[in-house]
Amino acid sequence: MEGDSYHNATTVNGTPVYHQPLERHRLWEVISIAAVTAVVSLITIVGNVLVMISFKVNSQLKTVNNYYLLSLACADLIIGIFSMNLYTTYILMGRWALGSLACDLWLALDYVASNASVMNLLVISFDRYFSITRPLTYRAKRTPKRAGVMIGLAWLISFILWAPAILCWQYLVGKRTVPLDECQIQFLSEPTITFGTAIAAFYIPVSVMTILYCRIYRETEKRTKDLADLQGSDSVTEAEKRKPAHRALFRSCLRCPRPTLAQRERNQTSWSSSRRSASTSGKPSQATDPSTNQAKAEQLTTCSSYPSSEDEDKPATDPVLQVVYKSRGKESPGEEFSSEDAEETFVKAQTEKHDSDTPNYFLSPAAAHRPKSQKCVAYKFRLVVKADGTQENNNGCHKVKIMPCSFPVAKEPSTKGLNPNPSHQMTKRKRMVLVKERKAAQTLSAILLAFIITWTPYNIMVLVSTFCDKCVPVTLWHLGYWLCYVNSTVNPICYALCNRTFRKTFKMLLLCRWKKKKVEEKLYWQGNSKLP
């Protein structure tokens, strides 16, 4: 071989014999391999870019668990852009034509990204395990900052393990033993070293992750059984028999979905708010100029809570609002409410008649701009509409009362007194937490299964080649190695299949609907109607 790696030729009796590119494959083979690998690479890139964009644009996805998935997507994106395409070129040409430096850089990037994927899966497995088995102690420490530290350590360990050895081994031993037309890790030329790295990089992590997942599954099933027993005992209480509406109220307090655009357009209102102390002094609140309201009263942003599908056959309950106070940050979500926390609000209802007799009120801020120094503190409130004696000001605004969900509604002729059973509330809360844990465990199981299926063939061939060097055909080596890359293609599909939020966000991004959705929501929540 010539010393200059950029001259693609060998010499026979001093005469250069140039290699013909793609000489080892027929034309149809080249076209087929190139087309298939190009499609897989494109799907990998698009899928993992969608994961990153989804994490950026959808705040619902910014959870601690999804930080680990974001890190995994970064590793998969590197593999989709660089590893897949360079390895395909290497296969089609039958030789490495980019030189030793490019070879070492590619191998370092490839092995660091692949090992980072394994490390991220380990971190996700331990995170799920501790979240299930130590919910009180571990979850208090489970913060985005801590997740960032763990992700950084996963990448740092992967870099330290592979990059220095791949790039510097030839200098440590004093020479490069890898032929110029080949690209492989020099220190893995010994079968025993290859065997050891396969054990450390694949078999041990897979064994640990499998054990952790089995324990996660067993603990989740145990908690599901305990919760079912608790729900069974709770459902036979007399309070539940007499007041079936309790379940609907508690569910409404926990869920506050945003209305659809059509509902928003039908139910836009303008409003102003004042403290209850103003009305108790005998002076009814009046709708005033928005600037005056902003100076004298805390502004509210609300969304109406509609009953879920499982509540449709139950008696209608009072609407529940999620209220965001624009305040100086003195309040906190954990504060206890008293009767003084009730709000009396003038709303100008522009609702249409629906099947239910209870009107739906959508309240918008009086002004689009708020002082930057103010903070948002979220509370959940119940909207109580008085049927008799409802006051109306000269602008046609009706007075309604907003009560905290935790504050019982006074028994008035026009309202239903709802006082949820505390034990039932606890059961509901436990069920919601358990549902989230089960979804996270399902995502982990899908990712882990995909990892085992795609990585096992290659690592089995590594073990076989240790004892029988010529037993594995070159074609199988290529397929096994490429199958490891396919894991990066499958991971985003697993996220979409197991996580509804990912799936919906992917769909909106692919259909270019996300920007339109954001604009509509911004217009709605800022309020597109002004006070008269």
Curated annotation (Swiss-Prot):
The UniProt family comment states: Belongs to the G-protein coupled receptor 1 family. Muscarinic acetylcholine receptor subfamily. CHRM5 sub-subfamily.
Q: Record's superkingdom?
A: Eukaryota
Name the record gives this protein: Muscarinic acetylcholine receptor M5
GO BP: adenylate cyclase-inhibiting G protein-coupled acetylcholine receptor signaling pathway; chemical synaptic transmission; dopamine transport; G protein-coupled receptor signaling pathway, coupled to cyclic nucleotide second messenger; gastric acid secretion; transmission of nerve impulse
**Per its UniProt record, what Pfam families does this chain match?**
7tm_1
Q: Name one GO molecular function term.
A: G protein-coupled acetylcholine receptor activity
Task: Please list the residues annotated as glycosylated.
Answer: 8
Keyword Glycoprotein annotated: yes
Residues spanning the membrane: 30-53, 67-87, 105-126, 147-169, 192-214, 444-464, 479-498
UniProt region (Disordered), positions on chain: 262-365
Per the UniProt entry, what species is this protein from, by scientific name? Macaca mulatta
Q: How does it sit in the membrane?
A: Multi-pass membrane protein
Where are the compositionally biased (Low complexity) regions?
A: 269-281
In its keyword annotation, does this UniProt entry include Translocase?
no
Protein's cellular compartments: Cell membrane; Postsynaptic cell membrane
